[in-house]
């Protein structure tokens, strides 16, 4: 669990959406540096209004996990995370009993019972056995904890907000784990045999945790009952314009030249045939962060090879792209109608650079920028 900041107020995203204030929620997301695709954000709002979990699938690095993290950051929400992996057990997700503490409890009461009159021992031990299953001995997993926190938030509806529960890389869960999640996802309750009270969680759709399930569609196909408990979205690779918006938002201190280099370079790499794994938005952000950190002002062969490690992640791919160095440098340093005009509309100095160069950069030598220019 990642707790919220107790020194800051919480914002309930479900309440914003139910009150017709989706634009405020969108702005909160953008202020964290994450720019959601409009269609994905619309689907998320439907998930909030319905109370259903939101299932998002897509390629790695497309922003599936970053979306709920941005919501949690923007709204100051507690975050619970279940990370998919081999061998994940139900007890790690929902609950388990602290058997050692229960055993200690019973030993202590058995010792105490020896000092009591025979007429009192039976009732005393019967009560001890019942209380062995009280809440104090219950260990909640991340999913169980999320539903429990949501129930607690209903006691302070004006100031508290439900947590976000991220079921990450659900295609690695396996059938038994998916089955264990069906009841909480549908009923909002986690039934615990022998527990005093019988369950944890909250049944009201508008009070449940905000559940976001992600899938890379790699390991195994999710079961129909599991999928049916969700609102669904597909995270596609963003358009170049959308990628520029995201890069600008995530790296606001980067110069226009650095943004242009990163966008053109990665766009060119994605256009090269023969790669097994193409760089995603995640790699674009990493590359731009590196450019900003190093105050990159020009992109030549030495620099390009130094940054290969951020977006070329296999030996075969490196060998292939090294053969394309001249092409990559040409594209990264040339005029790109989408990238350069998008930047020119937002930066007067970049617009002036385009005008002074005739809007076409033919060679690397024509595109050497001093850091002080931007």
What is each model feature region?
Residues 1-374:
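C-terminal regulatory/interaction module of P-loop NTP-utilizing enzymes
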């Amino acid at each position: 669990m990642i707790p919220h900041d107790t020194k800051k107020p919480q914002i309930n995203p479900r309440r914003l959406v139910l009150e017709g204030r989706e634009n405020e929620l969108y702005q909160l997301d953008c202020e964290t540096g994450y720019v959601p695709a409009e269609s994905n954000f619309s689907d998320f709002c439907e998930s909030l209004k319905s109370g259903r979990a939101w299932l998002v699938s897509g390629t790695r690095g497309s922003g599936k996990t970053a979306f709920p993290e941005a919501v949690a950051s923007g709204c100051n929400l507690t975050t619970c995370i279940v990370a998919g992996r081999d061998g994940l057990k139900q007890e790690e997700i929902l609950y388990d009993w602290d058997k050692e503490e229960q055993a200690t409890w019973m030993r202590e009461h058995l010792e105490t019972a020896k000092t009591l009159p025979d007429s009192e021992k039976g009732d005393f031990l019967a009560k001890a056995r019942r209380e062995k299953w009280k809440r104090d001995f219950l260990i909640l997993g991340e999913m169980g904890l999320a539903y429990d926190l949501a129930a607690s938030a209903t006691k302070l509806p004006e100031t508290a907000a439900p947590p976000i529960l991220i079921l990450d890389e659900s295609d690695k869960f396996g059938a038994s784990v998916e089955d264990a999640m069906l009841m909480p996802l549908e009923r909002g309750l986690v039934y615990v045999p022998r527990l005093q009270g019988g369950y944890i969680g909250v049944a009201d759709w508008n009070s449940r945790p905000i559940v976001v399930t992600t899938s890379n569609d790699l390991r195994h196909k999710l079961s129909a009952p599991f999928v049916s408990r969700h609102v669904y979205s597909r995270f596609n690779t963003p358009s170049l314009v959308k990628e520029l918006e995201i890069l600008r938002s995530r790296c606001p201190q980067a110069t226009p030249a650095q943004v242009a280099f990163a966008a053109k370079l990665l766009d060119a790499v994605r256009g090269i045939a023969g790669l097994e794994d193409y760089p995603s938005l995640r790699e674009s952000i990493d590359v731009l962060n590196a450019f900003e950190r190093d105050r990159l002002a020009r992109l030549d062969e030495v620099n390009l090879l130094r940054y290969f490690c951020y977006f070329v992640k296999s030996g075969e791919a490196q060998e292939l792209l090294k053969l394309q160095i001249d092409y990559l440098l040409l594209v990264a340093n040339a005029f790109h109608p989408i990238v350069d005009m998008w930047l020119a509309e937002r930066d007067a100095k970049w617009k002036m650079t385009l005008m002074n160069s005739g809007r076409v950069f033919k060679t690397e030598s024509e595109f050497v920028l001093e850091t002080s220019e931007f």
